[in-house]
């Protein structure tokens, strides 16, 4: 695909931002990652609790849940902490539920045993795509947490059934483009977030037109872009997980 339109970043239409996945970013959590999609930076941690929610008690399976938040100055202007306001926004609740659903799609929760894997995604700098970066980084953090369960003999086999990652796509200046940054996201005609597994299955597709409806052909082009982008992200996840721990 050629760069037939001028993206604010100068990237090709099918070009991801620079993606970095840094494991063992903090020392206390069983799994921790700094994930960077260009200037979007998210700390993802995975913590193990030897208990399950009440609705799963005595059912012999585990649970995975996620929380998401942004530092007050992660964006251009400071926002109040949600804890100070005493209430999470609808956006925050939507995103953390999405992260949880995405990761649960590749977990056999019975193999996890009667324990909970808590995923925390904290955005330290936002430039578009925070939810997709969170999912991509959180999977690696969860993988490291599971590795510790295996290493200590607390589980016999991995509950992880596949990889999962996410990316944004959109129609910008009439052209389908991959991995929207803030400037593109705020000006695009269509914005879509796509979550996929390593096997190529779709976990979630969130698509919205902004003023101009998109066609079936445009949707197919966006999904093709997303699929290629997610394949690249999963390759980066695998490369990060192959690196030896210090």
From Swiss-Prot:
- Pfam families hit by this protein: RNase_PH, RNase_PH_C
- Per its UniProt entry, what is the enzyme's top EC class, as one word? transferase
Q: Which CDD domains match?
A: RNase_PH_bact (cd11362)
| GO molecular-function terms, A-Z | 3'-5'-RNA exonuclease activity; tRNA binding; tRNA nucleotidyltransferase activity
EC number(s): the record gives 2.7.7.56
Q: Which residues bind phosphate?
A: 91, 129-131
Q: Name one GO biological process term.
A: rRNA processing
Q: NCBIfam families annotated for this entry?
A: RNasePH
What does the sequence similarity comment in the record state about its family?
Answer: Belongs to the RNase PH family.
Assembly mode: Homohexameric ring arranged as a trimer of dimers.
The protein depicted here goes by the name Ribonuclease PH
- Which species? Paraburkholderia phytofirmans (strain DSM 17436 / LMG 22146 / PsJN)
> What does UniProt list as this organism's lineage?
Bacteria, Pseudomonadati, Pseudomonadota, Betaproteobacteria, Burkholderiales
């Amino acid at each position: 695909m050629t760069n037939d339109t001028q993206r604010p970043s100068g990237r090709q239409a099918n070009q991801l931002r620079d993606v970095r996945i840094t494991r063992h970013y903090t020392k206390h959590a069983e799994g921790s990652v700094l994930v960077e999609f260009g200037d979007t930076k998210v700390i993802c941690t995975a913590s193990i609790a030897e208990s399950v929610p009440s609705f799963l008690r005595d059912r012999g399976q585990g649970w995975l849940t996620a929380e998401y938040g942004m530092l007050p100055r992660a964006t251009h202007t400071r926002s109040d902490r949600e804890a100070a306001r005493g209430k999470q926004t609808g956006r925050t609740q939507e995103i953390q539920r999405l992260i949880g659903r995405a990761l649960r799609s590749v977990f056999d929760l019975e193999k996890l045993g009667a324990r909970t894997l808590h995923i925390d995604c904290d955005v330290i700098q936002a430039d578009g795509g925070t939810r997709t970066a969170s999912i991509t980084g959180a999977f690696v953090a969860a993988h490291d947490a599971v590795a510790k369960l295996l290493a200590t003999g607390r589980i016999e086999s991995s509950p992880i059934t596949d990889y999962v990652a996410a990316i944004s796509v959109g129609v910008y200046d009439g052209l389908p483009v991959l991995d929207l940054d803030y400037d593109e996201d705020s000006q695009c005609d269509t914005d879509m977030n796509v979550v996929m597994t390593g096997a190529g299955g779709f976990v979630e597709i969130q698509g919205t037109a902004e003023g101009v409806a998109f066609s079936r052909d445009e949707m197919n082009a966006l999904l093709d872009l997303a699929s290629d982008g997610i394949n690249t992200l999963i390759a980066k996840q695998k490369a990060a997980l192959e690196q030896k721990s210090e």
